[in-house]
């Protein structure tokens, strides 16, 4: 779209891989924030279990779910008893995911979409996500530590640069889903 637009808005001042000829079209507006919503969130800690929220945004959550299934099978039962998973999952994976989680006797909630994202994020201890602009905005607003898997084929590699912003501010771990093995997870 860049060749055809007069200008475009960005959340971040720095836009990686933006061709020089389009930089004059960029208008930095910052992160979206609905003034009617309180952005001073009080973290509602789950006292009994750590809440892990897994969501892939509008695209790309299938690989997150598949990687999650690989990793969760390596976690001990004692550790799993201390965790609750809230998972946004594509409908086509619900049955497989639910079967695996039931077999592991895991505390979980699965939906294809959550309308109450701010409520969930206020209770979340760590998020496992993609790096779309909306997701990054949510993570920043909630000051939420995260493990981020940028969508590898995002245009201009923008998800990597979105994630790098949080990485540079020591707010996340960034993992490349194309170069993962279980040793990668154990180090994280």
Predicted regions and their residues:
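Active-site-proximal region of nucleotide-activated glycan assembly enzymes
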Residues: 1-40
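Alpha-helix C-terminal capping/helix-to-coil transition sites in glycosyltransferase folds
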Residues: 3-4, 122-123, 141
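Short, glycine/polar-rich helix-capping loops at beta-to-alpha or helix-loop-helix junctions
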Residues: 13-18, 96-97, 135, 156-163
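Short alpha-helical segment that forms part of, or immediately flanks, the ligand-binding pocket
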Residues: 118, 136-144, 164
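Acidic donor-binding loop of glycosyltransferase active sites
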Residues: 122-135, 144-145
């Amino acid at each position: 779209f860049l060749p055809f637009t007069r200008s475009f808005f960005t959340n971040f001042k720095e836009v990686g891989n933006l061709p020089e000829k389009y930089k004059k079209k960029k208008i930095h507006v910052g992160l979206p924030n609905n003034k009617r919503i309180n952005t001073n969130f009080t973290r509602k800690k789950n006292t009994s279990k750590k809440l892990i929220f897994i969501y892939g945004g509008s695209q790309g959550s299938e690989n997150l779910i598949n990687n999650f299934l690989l990793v969760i099978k390596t976690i001990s039962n004692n550790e799993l008893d201390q965790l609750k998973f809230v998972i946004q999952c594509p409908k086509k994976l619900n049955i497989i995911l639910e079967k695996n989680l039931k077999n592991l006797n895991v505390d979980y909630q699965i939906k294809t979409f959550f309308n109450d994202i701010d409520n969930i994020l206020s209770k979340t201890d760590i998020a496992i996500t993609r790096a779309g602009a909306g997701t990054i905005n949510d993570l920043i607003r909630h000051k939420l530590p995260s493990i981020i898997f940028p969508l590898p084929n995002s245009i201009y590699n923008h998800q990597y640069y979105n994630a790098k912003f949080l990485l540079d501010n020591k707010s996340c771990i960034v993992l490349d889903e194309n170069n993962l093995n279980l040793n990668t997870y154990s180090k994280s």
